[in-house]
Amino acid sequence: MFSAAPAEADGPGVGAPYVVTLGDSAISGEAGRWAGNTNQSSSKTDALGSTAYYDNAANTAETISGCHRSKAAEAHIGNGVMSANLACSGARTYTQTPGSGDFKPGLDFYSDANGRKGQALALQEFAATHNVKAVTVLIGANNFGFADIVQTCITNFLLSPSWWPNYCNDDSNVQAYFTTAAVNTQTTNVKNALLNVRQAMLNAGYADSSYKIIVQTYSSPIPNSSGFRYSQSGYTRQNTGGCGFWNADANWANSTAVVKINQAVTNGAAQTGLTNIRYLYATNALNGRRLCENTVGLLEEKGVATWQSTGAADKTEWVSQVRTLTTVFGPYQIQESLHPNYWGQKALRNCLRMAYNNGNPITGTCTRGTGLNAYGEPNMSFA
């Protein structure tokens, strides 16, 4: 009498292939609920509805409050590839356990009696029972105080007149994040986070040659000064557009802040010495569709009825408006401010699918196209 050999359990090299994403809000899916921006009814841009960030099995809640792992997140490339989004909005390279507020798992092996785990430990446990072919990482911006910087810039814009602007780029608390010593510290933090990813995979039974780490860079969210469709004089830049940055601060954001954060990411990756790293360069991926850019507009400015209208993705913004305590209302949340929205995330998902390259990940730069592909994502190129 013959019996079939027992089926091998899924794990390293066995079972359906998986892509796992680790990092912060820029990859977890923050703002993924919204497709474009409007100052009219929020229903016009509400692509995913009130359950947008629910990621538990029953679709009834978040597994970790505030992580905002949206259903539009780039992890979910499909095409026969399974996905797990372990990233968390607000995450730094290291785990944060505030006395009040939400738990923020970093790219470490944190574990506590409440069952809370760092993202590296979560990856290790997941990878042991799933066939992970690529781990995509986007981390570092919160180490540089991203949210604090944005708040400082917007506050300075709103509280100073155009004839005597108070810039954020020369504020001591902002400059402190970008000193040579500070950048070197964050570069080391990124390096160690990526080495934790490698250690997690090693602990789960993976040789370096059996998977790739795809290191992603941050996308510029706003244009340079010449690309804004609202003047910096008056208040329309913030009150209408939700992009209250002085021209000089917008230029600094692109020439200095985004550059130095991304240098910490790529230099940190290089310093690991790992040979299984690939790069997804996304710095300019949203160009032409950024917040308040003069090539796009609010839905009502472009005559677009809803996010589902033909051509909406080419006419409206791929980055969410900055909302403040006085302008946040209804279903919007302050933490969604200045993140790639539904369209931005779908565009980056397209990029990640191309970087994944059918299981043989490659390095490349992602560039925006026009129109939508068969998955309903903005067309992008990767080379």
Predicted regions and their residues:
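Catalytic nucleophile-elbow at a beta strand-turn-alpha helix junction centered on a G-D-S/GDSL motif
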Residues: 17-34, 45, 144, 342
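C-terminal accessory extensions appended to soluble enzyme cores
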Residues: 356-383
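Short, solvent-exposed loop/turn and secondary-structure capping segments
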Residues: 12-13, 29-35, 95-99, 146-151, ...
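Solvent-exposed loop/turn segments at secondary-structure junctions
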Residues: 25-29, 88-94, 141-146, 219-223, ...
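Conserved SGNH/GDSL esterase-like catalytic core that processes O-acyl groups on lipids
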Residues: 42-181
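A structural motif corresponding to the C-terminal end of an alpha-helix
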Residues: 74-83, 186-213, 249-281
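Mobile gating loops/cap/lid regions near enzyme active sites that modulate substrate access
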Residues: 220-339
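Secretory targeting and sorting signals
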Residues: 1-9
